[in-house]
Design a protein with these regions (language model features):
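N-terminal flexible segment immediately upstream of the FAD-binding catalytic core
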Residues: 17, 22-24, 28-102, 129, ...
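N-terminal glycine-rich flavin-associated loop
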Residues: 37-66, 86-133, 141, 145-178, ...
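Conserved glycine-rich FAD pyrophosphate-binding loop
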Residues: 77-79, 87, 132, 288-433
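Low-acidity, Ser/Thr- and Arg-rich intrinsically disordered low-complexity segments
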Residues: 5-9, 13
Length: 433
């Protein structure tokens, strides 16, 4: 995902000049706050070695491709450059549950971080997808992806308080901090979210964490059509309801197949219990059948949604497979209030998340322009998230991401020039700026 989709700035020169006045040389902290995630014997700070590798690459003119567990290798334009494996640089630097902040090295397995937080009744509220057992914290930040709760709690970038990186000159730098009220360097830290390793080596990240909600309920609304679901979600979004996540899909696993909307509520016990009958009444008025799911099954289904192991994500519809060999999974990000998109017959029925803001479809590479036009008309953009396994790079030739505007291209070039003047991280993962 292009860096420019992660920033609110509109003026390249003023923006980048202001950013780099805030640079500081990074010295790894010697202190530990609160609870350590792992025994220090299993933690490793490879800052010095990583700096040396970057400096060697700079001297040799070698481009570097940063990699953790490789769980998101499918994402982005290309995988060029000499591999710089980040898994050895791992461990939790500090964790203070009472302050709701954790600082962790990039190579730390995401499962380990989540287990530590769970032991203290806390979590990463944006529900980052793993897409594989080897997922690391660095890959989580670099991909910039958020899970089902994103529309209600915010995106990954909203939870980044500070980062420590190695830039293209081999310098270790720090931005932001470990407190939520920190201002200096805040936007620079967030630029790392979704940068796909093209701005520098992420050493550490400080993240805001949240307590696990005391109550949760998932409602299964069967027989709710796509536009009906969008209308309901828009109506509920304007009310004081603990709406946390939603997923609408044409459920082909049911016999006969039918439309279904899944809604997750999270919050105080009283709020969740009061909301369930209200949502049920609204859905029943439309002729839907409503069932409150068992918590273990609901939890497994939301995990499957996050990790894209639901039937929808496993394979394109058989009717489309019979006609096309270049079917890929497309990600359409649009305003939540966007009505059902009018898409051609070569595009599958969508799976809709984020209360209408995220729409997944299967479509052939030849439909790229149609999808991008539909998303842009709605005020959003379309991304080829997973290319056809049989065609891979061939289907990415038309571009994975929606092309940037000239202004956005200018800002991105300036950012890359400041972070990485020699272009050793310019692997083409985000396409040409």
């Amino acid at each position: 995902m292009a860096v420019m989709r992660r920033t609110e700035s509109a003026a390249a020169s003023i923006f980048t000049q202001a950013l780099f006045k805030k640079f500081k040389t990074y010295a790894p902290p010697a202190r530990t706050i609160g609870v350590m995630a792992t025994d220090t014997a299993f933690a490793a700070d490879l800052t010095a070695q990583l700096r040396a590798q970057v400096q060697q690459a700079l001297a040799a003119g070698t481009r570097l491709r940063l990699r953790g567990g490789g769980s998101k290798d499918f994402y982005g334009e290309t995988l060029n450059g000499a591999l710089l494996d980040m898994r050895g640089h791992h461990g939790v630097v500090s964790y203070e549950p009472s302050e709701l902040v954790v600082t962790v090295r990039a190579g730390t397995p995401l499962t380990e971080l989540e287990a530590l937080l769970a032991s203290q009744g806390q979590c990463l509220a944006f529900e980052p997808p793993h897409f594989g057992p080897g997922a690391t914290v660095g890959g989580m930040v670099a991909s910039g992806l958020s899970g089902p709760a994103r529309a209600s709690v915010g995106a990954l970038r909203d939870f980044i308080l500070g980062v420590k990186i190695i830039n293209g000159r081999g310098e270790a730098l720090t931005f932001g901090g470990q407190v939520m009220k920190n201002v200096a360097g805040y936007d620079v830290s967030r630029l790392m979210a979704g940068s796909l390793g093209t701005l520098g080596v992420l050493l550490e990240v400080s993240l805001k964490v949240l307590p696990v909600a005391p109550a949760e309920a998932t409602l299964w609304l069967a027989g709710v059509g796509q536009q009906q679901a969008l209308d309901l979600l828009n109506r509920w979004g304007g009310q004081a309801l603990p709406l946390n996540a939603s997923c609408w899909v044409h459920d082909s696993a049911e016999q006969p197949p039918r439309d279904a909307l899944f809604v997750r509520l999270r919050g105080a016990v009283a709020a969740v219990e009061a909301a369930c009958p209200r949502l049920t009444a609204d859905a029943v008025a439309l002729g839907a059948q409503v069932q409150r799911m068992d918590e273990p099954q609901a939890g497994a289904d939301w995990t499957a949604c996050r990790e894209q192991t639901l039937p929808f994500f496993k394979a394109p519809p058989s009717a489309l497979q019979a006609l096309h060999t270049d079917l890929g999974l497309w990600r359409l990000s649009v305003p939540q209030t966007t009505p059902a998109l009018a898409l051609p017959a070569v595009v599958s029925s969508p799976l809709i998340e984020w209360h209408g803001g995220l729409r997944w479809v299967w479509a052939p590479a030849s439909a790229a322009a149609l999808l991008r036009n539909a998303a842009q008309k709605a005020g959003g953009h379309a991304t080829l998230f997973r290319a056809s396994p049989s065609r891979g790079e061939a289907d990415k030739a038309g571009g994975v991401f929606t092309p940037l505007t000239p202004v956005q291209q200018g800002i991105q070039r300036e950012l890359q020039k400041q972070f990485d003047p020699a272009g050793i991280f310019a692997t083409g993962r985000q396409g040409a700026a």
